[in-house]
């Protein structure tokens, strides 16, 4: 294939030898790409600080036998500058990157929608105009829609009957909202504001989302995180570090299919040097 160009977001870094790094990108046209940045750890590196997590960059790469090689980089958006000095935004941003990494298992598989969703979410976080936790939960919900894991909100996940406007109960193992006739044991009963917030975040209705109270936001965060991690079959290392006021309620997952708990927060869980793979997409017509 020789040389090729693309735009991408830096998801994570991994040390390679004395001076190099493996950089994992989510790109616009080529999905997830892992490439070697030679000499990047030297103070005289021609890449400078352009290949850091959260960076939105224009790339030229050369196809290698096992890993591609980064040959040119130009910064399009340095989102990290608006995140690293703000702990809530930084940790929310790390959760975005880790989710993108986990949701893309195959390198080179197109993920245009996810890429656009990720760039929009990072722009919203770095801009500082939206609540970082709402941005994070909107991203997680809409990424699950792209992945085919969206929780049912207005209809019963089991029988498909529409609520009026919502059903009373939510079950992660069942797939979201459930009617009284289909509800399994362990289903929780979200408040009406929580249901409205779930629907608003999924649809990109920021007027409704930003008008909700702290309790609805907290409960929504718990449902979204539980639903995502059920489908990933493992916990996200970065989510417990997201500092939500009042904490996030634990949701009963019932008989979870072997959910793996990440026991080591190191190895780049928060956007540093680490091995890993992953990527994402957005919901058509729903802008962050």
What does each model-found stretch correspond to?
Residues 1-22, 26-288:
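Non-catalytic alpha-helical scaffolds and adjoining flexible linkers that form interface surfaces
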């Amino acid at each position: 294939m020789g040389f090729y160009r693309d735009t991408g977001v830096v998801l994570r870094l991994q040390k390679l030898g004395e001076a190099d790094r493996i950089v994992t990108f989510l790109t616009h046209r080529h999905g997830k790409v892992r490439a070697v940045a030679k000499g990047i750890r030297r103070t005289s590196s021609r890449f400078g600080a352009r290949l850091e997590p959260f960076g939105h960059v224009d790339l030229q790469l050369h196809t290698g036998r096992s890993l591609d090689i980064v040959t040119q980089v130009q910064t399009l958006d340095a989102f990290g500058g608006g995140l690293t000095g703000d702990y809530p935004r930084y940790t929310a941003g790390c959760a975005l990157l880790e989710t993108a990494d986990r949701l893309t298992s195959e390198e080179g598989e197109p993920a245009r929608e996810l890429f656009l969703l990720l760039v929009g979410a990072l722009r919203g976080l770095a801009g500082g105009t939206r609540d970082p936790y709402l941005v994070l939960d909107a991203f997680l919900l809409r990424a699950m829609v792209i992945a085919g894991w969206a929780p049912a909100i207005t209809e019963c996940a089991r029988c498909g009957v529409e609520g009026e406007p919502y059903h009373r109960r939510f079950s992660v193992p069942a797939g979201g909202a459930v009617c009284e006739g289909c509800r399994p044991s362990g289903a929780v009963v979200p408040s009406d504001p929580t249901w409205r917030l779930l629907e608003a975040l999924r649809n990109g209705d920021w007027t409704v989302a930003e008008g909700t109270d702290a309790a609805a936001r907290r409960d929504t965060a718990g449902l979204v995180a539980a639903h995502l991690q059920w489908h990933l079959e493992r916990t996200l290392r970065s989510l417990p570090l997201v500092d939500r006021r009042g904490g996030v309620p634990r949701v009963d997952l019932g008989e979870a299919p072997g959910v793996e708990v990440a026991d080591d927060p190191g190895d780049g869980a928060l956007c540093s040097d680490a091995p890993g793979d992953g990527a994402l997409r957005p919901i058509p017509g729903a802008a962050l």
